[in-house]
């Protein structure tokens, strides 16, 4: 009986050690990548927020996921082709719910000012390395500690350039689990680990479709890398990943997921 109790306590402890990252804020309940979503994430006790970054035509760091504004604001123009003044005119909330009508697209500078003490922001670079100089300026002006930040990207060159510019900030290589159209094969872990090590990234941030189990996580961590997963909105999947030893889980529902992991 004592052994069973100790085993249960160890499992609970491993679950609670998992960092919960709010995907584009609390995006299940509020419009993604808006101040409303970020504030709600903190209310739901998220450990961190994840947000996406593009450069506007005039060089501002815009918090937005898609390359264009059609899905969110009904405007089929690329963020990179819009000035910041034009971006400010877009309604980023009505598509989600009428109560969010008029919600605006924020800048990174603004979001960084709202992060509570002890929490952090995970910044996803959506474009090329040209974003790095402005990112350097904004992060320096924010006075945020490197411990309050992490940077992620699917774009290897962008992430590499960022890693070289911000050696004190954790960097994670994003990767999906889809078949290569040319070979028909799924990606393999070992080459991915090798790339991350060569670029001196701090870890991998993988889609939960990867065959993640205890052995998988051990292989990543034995290579000196941390292991993050996205985007998990299923309690059973989250519990499996937590028990396997992942460091963080990204979810659209941070408050709900924390309750499920109790």
What are these regions (language model features)?
Residues 1-8:
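Sec-dependent signal peptide recognition
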Residues 9-14:
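Hydrophobic core
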Residues 15-262:
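Phosphate-group recognition and catalysis centered on beta-loop-alpha active-site segments
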């Amino acid at each position: 009986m004592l052994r069973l109790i100790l085993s249960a306590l160890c499992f609970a402890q491993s679950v609670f050690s998992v960092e919960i990252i709010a995907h584009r804020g609390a995006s299940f309940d509020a419009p993604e990548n808006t101040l409303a979503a970020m504030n709600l994430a903190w209310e739901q006790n998220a450990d961190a927020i994840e947000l996406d970054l593009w450069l506007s035509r005039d060089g501002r760091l815009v918090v937005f996921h898609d390359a264009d504004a059609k899905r969110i604001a009904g405007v089929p123009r690329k963020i990179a082709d819009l000035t910041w003044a034009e971006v400010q005119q877009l309604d980023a909330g009505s598509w989600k719910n009428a109560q969010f009508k008029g919600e605006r697209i924020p800048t990174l500078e603004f979001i960084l000012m709202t992060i509570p003490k002890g929490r952090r922001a995970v910044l996803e670079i959506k474009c090329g390395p040209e974003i790095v100089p402005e990112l350097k300026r904004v992060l320096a002006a924010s006075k945020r500690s490197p411990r309050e930040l992490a940077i992620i990207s699917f774009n290897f060159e962008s992430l590499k350039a960022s890693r070289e510019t911000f050696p004190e900030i954790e960097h994670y290589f994003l990767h999906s689990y889809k078949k290569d159209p040319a070979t028909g094969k799924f990606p393999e872990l070992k080459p991915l680990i090798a790339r991350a090590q060569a670029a001196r990234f701090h870890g991998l941030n993988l889609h939960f479709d990867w065959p993640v189990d205890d052995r998988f996580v051990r292989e990543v961590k034995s290579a000196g890398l941390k292991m993050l997963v996205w985007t998990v909105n299923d309690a059973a999947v989250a519990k499996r990943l937590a028990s396997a030893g992942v460091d963080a889980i990204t979810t659209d529902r941070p408050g709900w997921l924390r309750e499920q992991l109790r």
